[in-house]
Structures are given as structure tokens and as C-alpha cells.
């Protein structure tokens, strides 16, 4: 939008909220609300305190749209100002600023028949003599002074010349010699809609290296859930091994994954191409990245040289001079370090890390007054500059003041361990290990990484006994919610392992590497941890996931996950994962249900487990029990995971109704089917607009027909024919279930329309035959899937089972029972837990 506002207005309360920000940095604006159907009303109930309408107003800074991102370069600062403010009485705001909101509309006055403009102005402050001016194509139409304020709303109707078009009008509000807000309607025209986003092509289909690079960058920037940038970079390097951009990009990718040695050659290759003709390249990013990588490798003299060469280029000077200053400070070359940091700050005076280092260097050089001024300026610029906060405390001589300052700083840091770790890392970066340890000791939480880092720094200071004690504390800490993820953590945890920490440190480092896709290292580390202490359930659980998903060893996965559950039989998450593994391994529904029945309280502790429990009841024919369990609980679905409990609700009632039909209890069947058509509130879900319920209406027609209610039965059969006759992959909750097409056909048969019926049955068979050998994969833009993604899914195999199921449905419709049975059998051989194939096989 080229306007600087977005808002929402409650016409019942005559009030609303506005967001105002410069559209050059906040171009994207979104208003979202659920619809008024059953599905939307259910989400209103879930997401609001008093079950009223749910509306999202969304804006972003430096982003055009909700899923769009922008880059934040090393040490870069992006600043913006935005205002959230209330307003009232204006109705539909046409333009707004932080000072005022205005509405302007033109319409025929029903009383006089004259064309009239209506102006409404709301101000956020008191303006006693504001001027409101309305102009048309021939000049001023209205000019009046009035008081406007949050309680004095200006409203006026102005009669317009007959030939006035709305776009000829302009309203402006002036006060104190300036314009508060203005608005001129734009000529109505059909806006040009942007093209929808396109999925990335496969690397081999992309023509140029530039496009391969940009696609890889896009996937990285958007942190795509299922696609990786690696194939795009590797394809580019296959075509041109010395490509500068791709070597830099792939080197950075490897470095961010902790593969420092593997990353180095890519930066050196980029430098080789950069200096092919000119020893002093136009852009020296590769030198900077090489310097950073060498720092992680501990080769600091080489890193210093690389940073110095990078500093020959304007774009890399801020970062390079900062790191050179830090490396010089580590060698106690404080004068040199100060020169470097001053040059870094020339490029970005707001670099808080550099400012903190400068204050520390000034203090080291005995320039106390200059250091004090620097600290004061730093804290004025950023009160959350914890390095400067600690420097201020160190410089204070009055013990009472010192304690008060320390208390205030700890209040700002909230005793949140990451704040202390971040600050300690900053100090350690320039060799201030003593300061780093003092910072870590301020946090009173018993958090493992605080002690591991303290030990690492204590060892650097030569305090071996202190380091040993810190390592002992780290190993004995509770591991809950400790998930190291920083590249600096690698060296710290490696040091801990090398110094005898074999129980927990390998576990933490294994987690870090698994997140960074280094699963072989993860498995080795977790196995080391398991050998040191095999009573830690999470280690066995992690190994199970890696064995199944990364090594293809389902037996080892089963062994480890069963061991994990045996160590903590009250861990519902581990039980959920174990059950999903049993499902993958082809355990029968009865076997799985028996394990749930051993301790129902586990399933009751989680919605996802409880829904699986109910599913197993239905699959084992315990429909009444499943229904009782459904009605005895309030469910809380997640967006994208809808449809699970409603499916089980429908299955339980439909299958009970089928039993009633078989035993000629037609009235009872009718009641059950009518109940199935309405979702009770406790399910937490409403019915999606467009849901056809063909299976329910077909069986309801049978129940009514058996009672002699032929007209009502015919209406039900007609309703059961409605819906698309195109089968789909059935991956998402809003996909039409395939058997709805079967019931369309069966309903057409009941209505005597054999041709329409057969066309449905053959469509199911044709789709199955045509797509049987398709390669299955997750759709590029998918952000949420309804199924648990604990263990890797073979979507090609899943697609084949689905196609066999579709062909079975088509043959059921055509009365080819033997063929149908064969296809159902094949579907269940491929996917033993196929729910719908199981239900139809029973019939």
C-alpha cells in the first residue's frame, strides 16, 4: 500500500485501532478474519476470550507480505517507528497519520437529492483552531476552523456541484501551520494484482548460475521447511567450480552448520577467482568470511590477515576492523585495537558491540574519563548494552552504588541465561575472560551452558581447579530446555567432552549438530553419552529418531525408543513417538490399542495422543466407546491439523448407524446419521464450507427409504450426489475424501442415473491407474501438515497405497467385489495403517 496506515473498526462500538508507519519501510499490511460459517465460528471460539469475532491486523517492517523477509547484514541496524493508536466515530478511515484520521465520502443525500460530501476528522491531540478545507476541481468548496481532539470529533456534510466526481475532491486538515492529514480519492480502476509466487524449479532445470545462486539464497532466507539450498549451490559449482557468489554462499552455509574446515576451501576458491586478474578485488566479502571461519578454527593470526585484506574494501570495513580490534586486544595490543575499533565505528557509529569494546579498551589504557563518557553514551543509545552496563559497574568505587547498579542491570537482564551468555561471549571475544566469568556468575539459574562456558574461560585463564568444578556442575544440571545452538557452543562443548564430560555434554552437542544437519556426528555423540549413562531416556529417544530417519535402521530405532519409554513410562511424548513407530513398523490396530489401554492417563494428557487412541478404537470396531471418549473431552486443534477428531466423530456415528441398518433399527440409524451431520462444540472445530457429507446423506437416504419416507430419502440421495467428481491426493484436511465420489455414484444409482454413477466409479479407477507410479512429495508451499512428522514419510509409497484404495472404491461401486478386495489388500500391504482401506475391508 502507498498509504501509511492500516486499521480495524467496530461499527457497533464506533471505535477502532490504527497502525501508522511510513509505507516505505512498512509497505505490507494485512487484515485477516475467519468467515461466518461453522468452521470460522469454531475458530472464533478457540481464539478469543469471550468467543467473539477474531480479527488479525498484521503489518511488518522491511517486508512486503507476511511470508517475505529482508536481509540483516553483520552488525547492521535497521530502525523504524510505528504507532498503534485508538480512534473513534470516523468509520471507514481514508487516510491517517499519527496526528489525525480522516474520512471523506460523496453520495446523494436521500432527503434533498443533492450530491453531498461527508467529512469526519479525528485528532490524537487537542488542536483548538484546526482548519478543515475541502476543495473541488474549481476551487475551495468548504473552509472552516474548529477544535478537534480525541473527544471533539469534527463531522460535516457539504453540498457539492452536480458535476463533481469523487476523485475531484480533496480534504486537508491544517493546524499550527502544518498539514495534519490530507486525502484525495483515487479514480476507481481495477488494480493490477501481483503474480502468485512460483515454486522453485529443480536445479537441473534452471538455466543460469545466477538463478541457481538466487534460488539457493531464497530457500535459505525463507528457511524452507522441506527444501534445502545445497542442491542449487552444488549444481552451480558443478557447472563452474570457481563461481564467486556460489562459493561464498555455500561456504557460509557450511560455516553456519559448524563445518568450519569444510567451509574454508570454498572461501579460498572464491578469493582465487576474485584475484584472477586484479589482486585487489572490487568486493572482498570472501576475505571477511574466510577470516570469520579461521576464527572458529582457532587460527587467529591467519584470520587477522584475512580481515585486514577484507578491510581494503568499503563494504567489509566495519566488521573486519571490529574483529581485528578484538584479535589485537586478545594479544594485549590495546593501542592497535583502539585504532581498529575507531575505524570500525566510522563505518557504523551505532555498532553496539564495537562501542562496548571501545569503552573496555579505553579503560584498559587508563583513559577513565573517556571510558566513562563512552559508557554513558552507549547506555543512552542502547540501555540494553549489557557490556557497557558491566563496565559502568566495574568503574564505580562506591560499594552501595555498585550494588544498586548491579541489581538494576540484573533486573534488565531478567536472570535470563541467554543474556548472560551473550554478554560473556562478547567479553571473551576480545580476551576479557575474567569479565566473562564474572558476568556468568551473576545469573542464578542452574543452567548447564553457564557452567560449561565458565569452565572454558577459567581454563583459558589457567584456573584448572575452578574449571574442573564448573564442569562438574554443568554435567549435574537438569538438562530440561537446554538446547545449545550457537557456533561458539561447539568449541565450549568440545572442550567439556575432551575434559571428561561424557554424560551430558555429548548429548547437548549432538542436539546442536542434529539441528545443523550433521546427523552422523550427532549419532556418535549421543552414543558416547549413552555409553556413559544409559538411564537418560531422551538420549535413547534421540538415537531412535536418527536410526530410523537417517540410518534406515528400524530395529535399532525400536530398541532405543522402547528403552526410552521403559525409563520414563509417564513421558507422553515418548509414548506418542513409540506408537507412531509401531504404526510405521506395521503393528496391528489391536496391538497398538492394547498398549494405550495399559495406561489411558497417558493418552488423556495430550490431544494428539487421545485422538490416536480414539482412532484405534474405531479401527478395532469399538465405535460406541470411541464416541463416548469423543463426547467426554474438549479438543483443541491446531491450524492445519484440523479434521482429525471430526473424522473420528463421523466414523463412530456412521459405523454405529450401519450396524443399526443391518439390524433393521432404521429410526436409530436416522438419529445417529443426523447427529453426525452436526459437529458439537467440544470438538473445537466447525464444518468447512463446501463439506458435502455424501456418505452420511447416502446412508440417511437408506434409513429413510427403509422407513417408507421416500420423498425425504430421494432428497438425501440427491444431496449425496453433490460435489466434485475429481479425485485428489488427500493430503490436507480440506481435500475432499475420495470415498465421497463413491457415494456420489451410489446415490446416482439409487436415483436411477446409472451413467452418472458409473462415470464416478470409473473416475476413481482412472485416477488410481494414471497416478499409481507417481513420485509423491510435499507441495512446495505447504507450511502445515495434518499428520505427525516424527518419522520420515515415503510419500511415493503413500501415493501408491492411496491409488490402490481409489481403485478399490471404484470397483466397489461397480460391484467388482473380488477386484476391490485385491486392491484393498494391496493398499494395506503397502500401508498397514491405512484407516479408510481398513474400514472398507471390513465391509
Go through each PLM region and give its residues.
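Residue-level recognition of tetratricopeptide repeat
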Residues: 217-218, 252, 292, 326, ...
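Hydrophobic/aromatic packing residues within the alpha-helices of TPR/SEL1-like helical repeat arrays
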Residues: 233, 267, 307, 341, ...
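Long, contiguous interaction/recruitment modules in multidomain scaffold/adaptor proteins
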Residues: 95-206, 386-388, 398, 456, ...
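Structural marker of alpha-solenoid helical repeat scaffolds
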Residues: 239, 272-279, 313, 347, ...
Amino acid at each position: 500500500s502507498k498509504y501509511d496506515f492500516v486499521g480495524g473498526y467496530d461499527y457497533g462500538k464506533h471505535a477502532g485501532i490504527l497502525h501508522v508507519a511510513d509505507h516505505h519501510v512498512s509497505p505490507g499490511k494485512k487484515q485477516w478474519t475467519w468467515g461466518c460459517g461453522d468452521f470460522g465460528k469454531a475458530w472464533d471460539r478457540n481464539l478469543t476470550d469471550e468467543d467473539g469475532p477474531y480479527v488479525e491486523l498484521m503489518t511488518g517492517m522491511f517486508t512486503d507480505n507476511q511470508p517475505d523477509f529482508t536481509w540483516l547484514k553483520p552488525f547492521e541496524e535497521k530502525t523504524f517507528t510505528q504507532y498503534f493508536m485508538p480512534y473513534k466515530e470516523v468509520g471507514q478511515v481514508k487516510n491517517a497519520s499519527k496526528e489525525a484520521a480522516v474520512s471523506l465520502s460523496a453520495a446523494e443525500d436521500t432527503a434533498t437529492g443533492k450530491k453531498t460530501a461527508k467529512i469526519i476528522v479525528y485528532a490524537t491531540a487537542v488542536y483548538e483552531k484546526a482548519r478543515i478545507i475541502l476543495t473541488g476541481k474549481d476551487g475551495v468548496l468548504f473552509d472552516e476552523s474548529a477544535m478537534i481532539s480525541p473527544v471533539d470529533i469534527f463531522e460535516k456534510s457539504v453540498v457539492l456541484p452536480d458535476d463533481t466526481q469523487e476523485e475531484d475532491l480533496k480534504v486537508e486538515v491544517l493546524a499550527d501551520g502544518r498539514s495534519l492529514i490530507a486525502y484525495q480519492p483515487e479514480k476507481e480502476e481495477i488494480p493490477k494484482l501481483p503474480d502468485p509466487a512460483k515454486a522453485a524449479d529443480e536445479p537441473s532445470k534452471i538455466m543460469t548460475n545466477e538463478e541457481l545462486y538466487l534460488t539457493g539464497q531464497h530457500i535459505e532466507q525463507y528457511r524452507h521447511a522441506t527444501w534445502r539450498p545445497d542442491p542449487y549451490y552444488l549444481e552451480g559449482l558443478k557447472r563452474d567450480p570457481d563461481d564467486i557468489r556460489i562459493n561464498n554462499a555455500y561456504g557460509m552455509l557450511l560455516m553456519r552448520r559448524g563445518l568450519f574446515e569444510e567451509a574454508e576451501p570454498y572461501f579460498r576458491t572464491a578469493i582465487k577467482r576474485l584475484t584472477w586478474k586484479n589482486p585487489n578485488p572490487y568486493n572482498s566479502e570472501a576475505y571477511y568470511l574466510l577470516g570469520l571461519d579461521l576464527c572458529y578454527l582457532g587460527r587467529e593470526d591467519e584470520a587477522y590477515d584475512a580481515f585486514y585484506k577484507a578491510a581494503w574494501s568499503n563494504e567489509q570495513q566495519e566488521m573486519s576492523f571490529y574483529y581485528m580490534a578484538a584479535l589485537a586486544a586478545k594479544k594485549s595490543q590495546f593501542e592497535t585495537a583502539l585504532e581498529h575499533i575507531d575505524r570500525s565505528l566510522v563505518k557504523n557509529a551505532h555498532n553496539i558491540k564495537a562501542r562496548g569494546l571501545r569503552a573496555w579498551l579505553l579503560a584498559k589504557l587508563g583513559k577513565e574519563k573517556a571510558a566513562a563518557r563512552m559508557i554513558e553514551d552507549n547506555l543512552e543509545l542502547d540501555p540494553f548494552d549489557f557490556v557497557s552496563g558491566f563496565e559502568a559497574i566495574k568503574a564505580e568505587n562506591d560499594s552501595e552504588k555498585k550494588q544498586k547498579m548491579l541489581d538494576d542491570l540484573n533486573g534488565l537482564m531478567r536472570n535470563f541465561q541467554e543474556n548472560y551468555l551473550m554478554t560473556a561471549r562478547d567479553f571473551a571475544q576480545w580476551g576479557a575472560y575474567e569479565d566473562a566469568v564474572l558476568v556468568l556468575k551473576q545469573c542464578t539459574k542452574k543452567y548447564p551452558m553457564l557452567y560449561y562456558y565458565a569452565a572454558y574461560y577459567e581454563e583459558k585463564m589457567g584456573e584448572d581447579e575452578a574449571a574442573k568444578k564448573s564442569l562438574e556442575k554443568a554435567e549435574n544440571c537438569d538438562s530440561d530446555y537446554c538446547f545449545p545452538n550457537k557456533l561458539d557452543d561447539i568449541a565450549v562443548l568440545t572442550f567439556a567432552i575432551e575434559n571428561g564430560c561424557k554424560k551430558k555434554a555429548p548429548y547437548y552437542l549432538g542436539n546442536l549438530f542434529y539441528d545443523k544437519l550433521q546427523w552422523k556426528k550427532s549419532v556418535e555423540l549421543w552414543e558416547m553419552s549413552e555409553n556413559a549413562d544409559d538411564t537418560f531416556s531422551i538420549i535413547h529417544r534421540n538415537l531412535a529418531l536418527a536410526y530410523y530417519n537417517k540410518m534406515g535402521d528400524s530395529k535399532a530405532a525400536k530398541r532405543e525408543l522402547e528403552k526410552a519409554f521403559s525409563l520414563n513410562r509417564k513421558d507422553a511424548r515418548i509414548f506418542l513417538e513409540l506408537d507412531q513407530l509401531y504404526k510405521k513398523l506395521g503393528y496391528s490396530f489391536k496391538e497398538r490399542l492394547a498398549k494405550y489401554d495399559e495406561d489411558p492417563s497417558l493418552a488423556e494428557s495430550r490431544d494428539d495422543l487421545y485422538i490416536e487412541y480414539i482412532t484405534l478404537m474405531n479401527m478395532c470396531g469399538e465405535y460406541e466407546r470411541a464416541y463416548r471418549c469423543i463426547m467426554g473431552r474438549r479438543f483443541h486443534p491446531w491450524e492445519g491439523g484440523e479434521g482429525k477428531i471430526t473424522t473420528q466423530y463421523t466414523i463412530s456415528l456412521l459405523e454405529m448407524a450401519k450396524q443399526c441398518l443391518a439390524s433393521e433399527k432404521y429410526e436409530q440409524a436416522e438419529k445417529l446419521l443426523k447427529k453426525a451431520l452436526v459437529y458439537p462444540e467440544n470438538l473445537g472445530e466447525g464444518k468447512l464450507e463446501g463439506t458435502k457429507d455424501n456418505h452420511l446423506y447416502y446412508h440417511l437416504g437408506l434409513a429413510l427409504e427403509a422407513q417408507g419416507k421416500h420423498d425425504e430419502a430421494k432428497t438425501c440421495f440427491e444431496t449425496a450426489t453433490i460435489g466434485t467428481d475429481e479425485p485428489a491426493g488427500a493430503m490436507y484436511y480440506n481435500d475432499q475424501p475420495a470415498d465421497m465420489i463413491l457415494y456420489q455414484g451410489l446415490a446416482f444409482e439409487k436415483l436411477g442415473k446409472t451413467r452418472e454413477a458409473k462415470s464416478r466409479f470409473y473416475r476413481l479407477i482412472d485416477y488410481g491407474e494414471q497416478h499409481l507410479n507417481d513420485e509423491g512429495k510435499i507441495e512446495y508451499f505447504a507450511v502445515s501438515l495434518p499428520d505427525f512428522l516424527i518419522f520420515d514419510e515415503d510419500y511415493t509409497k503413500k501415493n501408491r497405497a492411496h491409488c490402490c484404495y481409489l481403485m478399490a472404491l471404484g470397483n466397489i461401486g461397480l460391484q467388482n467385489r473380488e477386484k476391490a478386495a485385491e486392491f484393498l489388500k494391496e493398499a494395506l500391504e503397502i500401508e498397514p495403517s491405512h484407516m479408510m482401506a481398513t474400514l472398507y475391508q471390513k465391509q
